[in-house]
Amino acid sequence: MRQEVHDAARRARVAARALAVMPTVAKDHALRAAATAVTAHTEEILAANAEDLQAARATDTLAATLDRLALDRQRIDQIAGGLRQVAALPDPIGEVLRGYTLPNGLQLRQQRVPLGVVGMIYEGRPNITVDAFGLAFKSGNAALLRGSSSAAKSNQALVEVLHAALVSEDLPADAVQLLSAADRSTVTHLIQARGLVDVVIPRGGANLIDAVVRDAQVPIIETGVGNCHVYVHQAADLEVAERILLNSKTRRPSVCNAAETLLIDAAIADHTMPRLVAALQGAGVTVHGGLSGDPDKADLCREYLSMDIAVAVVDGVDAAIAHINEYGTGHTEAIVTTNMAAAQRFADGVDSATVMVNASTAFTDGGQFGFGAEIGISTQKLHARGPMGLSEMTSTKWIVWGDGQIRPA
């Protein structure tokens, strides 16, 4: 299996070199062709997904996991739409970030270039297969994809559609390759392919991400766990707070930007907590803590990915910041308040990739941010942080123009 992974990486390197200098118009045309192909092959994709779902149900898979795995016509249309959105976005490659002329006449320019060969390890969600391809391709990168065994048939069907679209445009099919999900060693070989793979992005649960970070020999961009908070400040409009809380928790509880903890300001807890807890329970959410007292520490640390939420009381905005910085995962936090000074203090003090002021945590998403799609939501601080779009899939290089200058001794 090691040889198979390395051979795939070498083919990806060849494709990446072609993509790095490919004109924007060619990339955009190919992405639109891929979108059309995905839509045209909806029936085949749904049939493959049905097999994955049937196998998952036979093993008593959790409802949240089934939701992430499932495709329907609407989700396939969204996948194709994401490719069209990426095609419509500006090409980051060649963008000049800064440039200036030195006293000796040398002209310096720093510009964006592709990362190269990007490995992607992900669980469950087959839409990531196409999202990763779209962002990698537009930014001039070749993608090595390793999805989960639970979505193997769905991922294979999607990659076959992408390959056919690329070949129809006389472009290298090796720009996107699907590694075997049947052998767990493919993950190890991918994350240890130093010199063949430029970066690996794991997207999944804490166990997957921790294992990849621990064992990797190539650079990793963590797309972290989402223990997201909604803090209802003492100056909150409670109708707005209730609306934001329910959307953050119940819109799609199985995704990483769903709220997992509600923090209520002590100054308003007596009359606010019963209302918000009742709203949550009325929507089918199981409340941990709240009216029965503060939740256990384990509940405060948990990414439920289900219709569960921890509820706790904090003594003001500084206590909310301290709580989030201790228990949060650096993903997305929201404050609901009409006090803009408190909102700014919260935004400045919380150490997370995204801070929402009077808005749902569900907006932390590449599509919502105008990226067309996202490769993941990075919770680390180096290279990229927050939703990763096209720009985050690039590096930079310096180009220096001269007319014969030499450096003095």
UniProtKB/Swiss-Prot annotation:
One of its GO terms (biological process) is L-proline biosynthetic process. Its EC number is 1.2.1.41. Its main location: cytoplasm. Disulfide bonds: none annotated. Pathway: Amino-acid biosynthesis; L-proline biosynthesis; L-glutamate 5-semialdehyde from L-glutamate: step 2/2. GO terms for molecular function: glutamate-5-semialdehyde dehydrogenase activity; NADP binding. One of its GO terms (cellular component) is cytoplasm. It is found in: Cytoplasm. It catalyses: L-glutamate 5-semialdehyde + phosphate + NADP(+) = L-glutamyl 5-phosphate + NADPH + H(+). Transmembrane segments: none annotated. It is an enzyme of class 1 (oxidoreductase). Pfam families: Aldedh. Keywords: Amino-acid biosynthesis, Cytoplasm, NADP, Oxidoreductase, Proline biosynthesis. InterPro entries: Ald_DH/histidinol_DH, Ald_DH_C, Ald_DH_N, Aldehyde_DH_dom, G-glutamylP_reductase_CS, Glu-5-SA_DH, GPR_dom. The keyword NADP applies. Belongs to the gamma-glutamyl phosphate reductase family. Catalyzes the NADPH-dependent reduction of L-glutamate 5-phosphate into L-glutamate 5-semialdehyde and phosphate. The product spontaneously undergoes cyclization to form 1-pyrroline-5-carboxylate. This is Gamma-glutamyl phosphate reductase. It comes from Mycobacterium leprae (strain TN). The gene is proA.
